[in-house]
Amino acid sequence: VKSTNLMAFVATKMLERQEDLDTCTEMQVEKMKASTKARLRTESSFAPRTWEDAIKDEILRRSVDTSSLDRWPELKQELENVSDALKADSLWLPMKSLSLYSEVSNQEPSSIPIGEMKHQILTRLKLICSRLEKLDHNLSKAVLGIQNSEDLILIIYNRDICKNTILMIKSLCNSLI
């Protein structure tokens, strides 16, 4: 999310620079403004989520009605009290997987049980890390074309943030392993 917002921010700064130099025609500037505004509007819809929000989204994705979310602690207790005969039922596995999501959400990264959940987290973190590395690479190329010292300072600052975020994600991945 931060990387895409960063790209939109850099695009906005580049647009301002273009306007200052007055090298574009008025129509091109308007097209670039519209494109930048559309990008910012699109990216703002992707807000950071907590584990609890992700759990609720997963529950909704699995077609559980929203009224049951208010009763989630009671439902979890009911799931834990299911008899052995019901465990053999075909509904038991999806219900059990829902309870695992809430248990995992409150745990330290190193104590998440080995399995599919840990693999999914690692896969997503590695994907985020690779996208941040690509963004860092693109920012390093953008530095070469910048002549304004303010823009240069902003890009260098954002590259540092990008690198620090990459290091934090790699550290988190190592703690999960």
From Swiss-Prot:
A GO cellular component annotation in the UniProt record: virion component
Compartments in which it is found: Virion; Host nucleus
Keyword line: Host nucleus, Host-virus interaction, Transport, Virion
Any Pfam family matching the protein: Flu_C_NS2
Nuclear export signal, short sequence motif: residues: 91-100, 117-127
UniProt-listed InterPro entries: Flu_C_NS2
Entry keyword annotation includes Transport: yes
Primary residence: virion
Known function: Mediates the nuclear export of encapsidated genomic RNAs (ribonucleoproteins, RNPs). Acts as an adapter between viral RNPs complexes and the nuclear export machinery of the cell. Possesses no intrinsic RNA-binding activity, but includes a C-terminal M1-binding domain. This domain is believed to allow recognition of RNPs to which the M1 protein is bound.
Subunit-structure text: Binds M1 protein. May interact with human nucleoporins and exportin XPO1/CRM1.
Protein name according to UniProt: Nuclear export protein
Organism: Influenza C virus (strain C/Yamagata/10/1981)
